[in-house]
């Protein structure tokens, strides 16, 4: 299967959300991680009620974690321009000049089992994040033929997942998504792992 299907999926998703660019990744949390690494972030602000993998990034990346009481809907800001939009599914909802991370995990509206996408503004950001997701390389050139200049993290979406996304996309666009509420997640600050 060709990696061209990933580009097609990225283009259709960016068009749906109204974003100039979209970088397909293996999961939403890894998309957020790539954005934090790319922007060299030293602190994230995380709602007490969200999915647990987001605050775990602070430990993984050795950055500061600040909890916030926030009743959020569809998305929230980790930094001034990095957004966890894991549950967002609304046309033309991209917020300009941000990095929005959307999930395609099996419980999400476009349920692919696993997967995510980073919505972004510029070609420069797209290329940098794409390379980071592909072991530091350009996906269109065999890696042995490249002088790789940046670290990468092997977080790319597989062509099979992208094809599944294309196959399910029209139905996802036609159907109303679940409206998640903040109490769908527990208060993470009460968990032992965050009291250490």
Q: Residue spans of the language-model regions?
A:
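A structural motif shared across PLP-dependent enzymes of the aminotransferase-like
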Residues: 1-8, 71, 167
């Amino acid at each position: 299967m060709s990696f061209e299907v990933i580009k097609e999926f990225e283009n259709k998703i960016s068009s749906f959300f109204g974003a100039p660019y979209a970088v397909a990744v293996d999961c939403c949390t890894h998309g957020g991680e790539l954005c934090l690494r790319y922007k060299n972030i030293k602190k994230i602000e995380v709602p007490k009620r969200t999915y647990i993998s987001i605050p775990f990034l602070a430990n993984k990346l050795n950055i500061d974690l600040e909890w916030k009481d926030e009743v959020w809907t569809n998305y929230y800001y980790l930094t001034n321009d990095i957004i966890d939009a894991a549950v967002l599914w609304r046309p033309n909802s991209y917020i300009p000049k941000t990095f929005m991370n959307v999930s395609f995990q099996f419980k999400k509206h476009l349920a692919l089992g696993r997967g995510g996408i980073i919505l972004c503004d510029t070609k420069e950001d797209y290329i940098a994040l794409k390379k980071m997701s592909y072991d530091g390389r350009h996906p269109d050139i065999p890696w042995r033929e490249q002088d790789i200049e940046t670290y990468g993290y092997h977080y790319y979406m597989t062509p099979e997942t992208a094809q599944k996304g294309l196959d399910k996309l029209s139905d996802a666009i036609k159907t109303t998504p679940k409206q998640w509420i903040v109490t769908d997640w527990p208060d993470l600050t009460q968990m032992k792992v965050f009291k250490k």
